[in-house]
């Protein structure tokens, strides 16, 4: 298994952050790692979406867990490995909200692909979380 986590605190209210997360079609507005996105349903477990990174191939993903106002998990199943990212809101220091992105790569090929693919997937997490926080704090 390969794993990585990044978090940041913000003064933005959890419901404001959640509003931006739960509007998948708007993700490219604040996430520079997404050139285009197509959603096949509501923001709920089981909904699939196709995310296209800049200069990249479209990736088919699925929401596997949604706890309104708290967390959602998306997953890309590549057969011999699965990339799973949990996006979570937690109480922070002095009334702040902590935004957490955690990615795990699991499955039979995880030890082979994780060390190369994982850092490529998660390299922009600090920038993505910072952009979300800036948007939510407006």
Identify the role of each PLM range.
Residues 61-62, 83-86, 109-115:
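A short, polar/proline- and glycine-enriched secondary-structure boundary/capping micro-motif
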Residues 7-9, 75, 88, 100-104:
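Residue-level recognition of well-ordered beta-strand positions that form the cores
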Residues 1-38:
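Hydrophobic ligand-binding cavity/cleft-lining segments
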Residues 77-81, 102-109:
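Short, solvent-exposed aromatic-acidic interface loops
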Residues 38-84, 98, 131-138:
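Glycine-rich portal/gate segments that line the openings of hydrophobic small-molecule binding cavities
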Residues 104-138:
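A conserved amphipathic terminal alpha-helix motif
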Residues 65, 87-93:
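Short, low-complexity Ser/Thr-rich regulatory SLiMs
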């Amino acid at each position: 298994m390969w794993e990585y986590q990044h978090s940041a605190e913000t003064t933005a209210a959890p419901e404001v952050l959640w509003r931006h997360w739960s509007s998948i079609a708007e993700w490219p507005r604040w996430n520079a790692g997404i050139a285009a996105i197509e959603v096949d349903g509501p923001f709920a477990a089981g909904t699939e979406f196709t995310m296209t990174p800049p200069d990249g191939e479209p990736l088919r993903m699925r929401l596997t867990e949604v706890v309104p106002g708290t967390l959602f998990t998306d997953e890309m199943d590549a057969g011999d490995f699965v990339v799973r990212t949990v996006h979570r809101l937690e109480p922070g220091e002095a009334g702040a909200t902590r935004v957490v992105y955690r990615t795990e790569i699991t499955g039979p090929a995880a030890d082979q692909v994780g060390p190369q693919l994982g850092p490529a997937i998660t390299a922009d997490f600090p920038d993505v979380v910072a952009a979300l926080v800036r948007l939510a704090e407006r």
